[in-house]
Amino acid sequence: MNEIRDILIGVDFGREVSQICYYDRKRQEPAEVSMKVGANLFENSTCVCCWGKNQEWSIGLEAEYFAREREGFLVENLFELCEEDQGVQVGEQYMEAWELAAVYIQGLIRFLGSMEPVKNTKCLAITVQRLNGKMVKNLQKACESCLWTTPRAFTTMLTASDQIFAAGMWDGSILKAMKCRFENCLPA
């Protein structure tokens, strides 16, 4: 990632897969972030896994691996849990939908490689295919629990009916909409 301060982050939070990107000011365009070093793998399964005696968390491909190989507790229906505001039993603990979403969002943001992502983020935009009040509440609480409550960062949520997506271009990628939406965050 080329950015170190005032990072503009976009997250596509999807039913089955999600992805993250950031706005590269040098190239003046959004840049995708690979989920696997040395590969062009930009989508990550929208799931989390709690595993091991230390209750470690993983997301996406790693979550699927640890569920299979280390007998972790895999939560695959994260999108639906947030949409319906339902918690779920994960091992010995009961987790609310927003808590699981926070684990997932933090995990995605780690792929950016920023040492202090909250401090260095100017804007976090989250897109979803379908938005309801429960989803908004869960994603807002997830971001707040990740400490995205300072004036330096804010969350924007878009839906398939948002004017940016009016042409029906929602294809699992926020990239085309990022530049348009983030122009409001860029210095004049």
What kind of region is each of these model predictions?
Residues 2-32, 166-188:
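Gly/Thr-rich phosphate-binding beta-strand-loop-beta motif of the actin/hexokinase/Hsp70
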Residues 43, 80, 160, 166-167, ...:
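Generic detector of low-complexity/intrinsically disordered segments
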